[in-house]
């Protein structure tokens, strides 16, 4: 059977797809709240610095690794050294876990969008306790994502991203403009969100900014390696990486402009509780209900936007695992995608059930080592594994490939880097960025230990050990890692 190599048809398609992966639910509820609680505009400045110091360097390196290998993350590492393939296997396991709980949240956003359309946004009291509905809408959300995945890279992911990302941005800007013209309470909302407070900046605030920059950009989970494998040498990696980082940061900033003035105008008493998942699924529906007739329109537009952010993120997560199954087991794309989504859906069922009654406001019934399933999976992946995986990328590019060779290959497509940027990149990728990522990892471990969640740490590193064993047992000697099958970054005909 003849195989065909496919990828993104254009640079803008790649940028929008990667931005779609980076722009997720964390941008819309995590960044605004963290900004409001950690020094406002002062925190934003620190966050932007972290995007440059951690985000840009790591993302560029991961995209480069993918384009260099034209293959899945495991093969990308294996082509550098046969004993490094397990690092890529860890990068494939991470999104597999994230899909399982992210799809539950995606099901919520889908349900909220539909209920907003019918004028019933405040559904948390009934929806969260209806296990059947939770499972149903998780399935619907995964099906919506699968439709895009099954279309392939060019006709599925790229085409969808070219439509969905501009729509998401336009809706967000429209809601922000509306929020800023509400009148009373707007100034208070903006002050709550962005009032500079340098006295409130502590080392912990810096850690929060570093962590947010890291997680917001989809680093350390194989996505940028996978999407990078679908690009050619004609794509300017430096410019593309910069545009992805800028788009992601803009969305996060504008989200706060849309949310806090609205909350302050319609119910300022809710400002103090405007955080996390509760902000998205409890506070904002209450605000929309208080808007009267226009609230239905704003609510529908908002949750459609949130659903788009969730879908584009999950699509990228599924694609990482799907690409691996296609290339390593020679599966058809549709079959591989169905297997990945099916397994993740089965695992998502206990996650949805474990959340219990109004679990996004109250502590859910413990299911795994004293934590609900969603929190446990989130802590394992975001707090422990993602920094480890990103650290692998920096070490491999900085010390195995070397910055000089990496820069030469990045420039191979006629996209030269300025001399000063080459020098800065060499220092950053070898020393500064790995050190900062290590600080993020240590800070995360300390927070888990302080919270009594040592089981999270043990489970996460046990997964890494399992990936090492699995790689050396099943994949290391299977092939050289450089044959045509491994380097095929595309689909098998269906």
Task: Describe the function of each predicted region.
Residues 10-48, 225-228, 239-242, 246-249:
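Transmembrane helix-boundary motif of multi-pass solute transporters/channels
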Residues 2-6, 33-38, 68-90, 103-156, ...:
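Inter-helical loop and helix-membrane interface segments of multi-pass membrane transporters/permeases
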Residues 7-18, 43-46, 83-96, 137-141, ...:
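Select transmembrane alpha-helical segments in multipass membrane proteins
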